Amino acid sequence: MFIVKNLNFNFLNVISNFLPNKMLENVFIELYERGILLFLDVDSYCKNSDDADLNILKGRKEFLKYFDEPLEKGYVFTFNTDIHKLYKEIEEESCAVISYGYESDTDDKADDVGRNFVEILNKNGYITDWTEEVKDSKTIKIVIDENDIPNFKLNESPYLLNLTNDDLFENKNPLIQLIEDEPFPTTKNHNNDKRETNDKDDQQLKLNKMKEIEEKTIAFIDKNSLTKSQIEEYCTQQIINLDAIDTTDEIVKCRRKETIQNLQQVSLPTLKCSKCLKLYKQKKSYEKHIEKCN
């Protein structure tokens, strides 16, 4: 695993092709192969199995009361209890933070589980570190998106498997749209006017999309307790999304460049919240705020 810093973001799309493909399934398969027990739902790896009790899993003494077999290594579980809330956050924010816990019957064995977990996550492209905070809390946080979850769309939209004729005709399914009749041919001038209108609409849509990406990125960082590496990774992904917006419009190009620069500032190690960014841009009381923020 390598981290690229101070890179011209025009080349991010190329470099991202050489990074490991992230998929939670790969992480937990390897954990299982190393002898670590998993109390996770294998359809998503983002919630515990139906028969697992979080209150028992997160406490060593409580767990050992119910688990009679000797623990060879240890076990892993998640603190997430609402899979649909997690899916919704991914749909709205393009990603989400999920917390996993780990334990064993001794501190040394628990540390081995944690180190193995971090190592495998890093190998599969997830940004996290083995720190004293992780060791003390026995909690590992990672940023995920829909590509990390097996069968994400299937899990989130089970109603797609149960459509009836009434659903189809009443257009209850949001993925099904009625096809309008083909319009009559129009004059050349009318077509030109329509093209200009479409160009303006397209411009506004792209400007709105860029604004939405910037606002959601800053809000997401403010809302979640992320490490500096995770902030850098998340901002980099959003910059890749911005760079993928294809346009020849000069206004859109300028706005895209400005938005990318803003997100580059957010991902700087010294900028930890949206207020940091605002003060940095305004050059007002920046140093004092940074001392408090850090």
Curated annotation (Swiss-Prot):
It comes from the Viruses. SUPFAM superfamilies: BAG domain. Pfam families: BAG. Residues 190-204 have a biased composition (Basic and acidic residues). GO terms for molecular function: protein-folding chaperone binding. Residues 181-204 are annotated as: Disordered. InterPro entries: BAG_dom_sf (IPR036533), BAG_domain (IPR003103). Gene3D superfamilies: BAG domain. Belongs to the IIV-6 391R family. This is Uncharacterized protein 391R. It comes from Invertebrate iridescent virus 6.
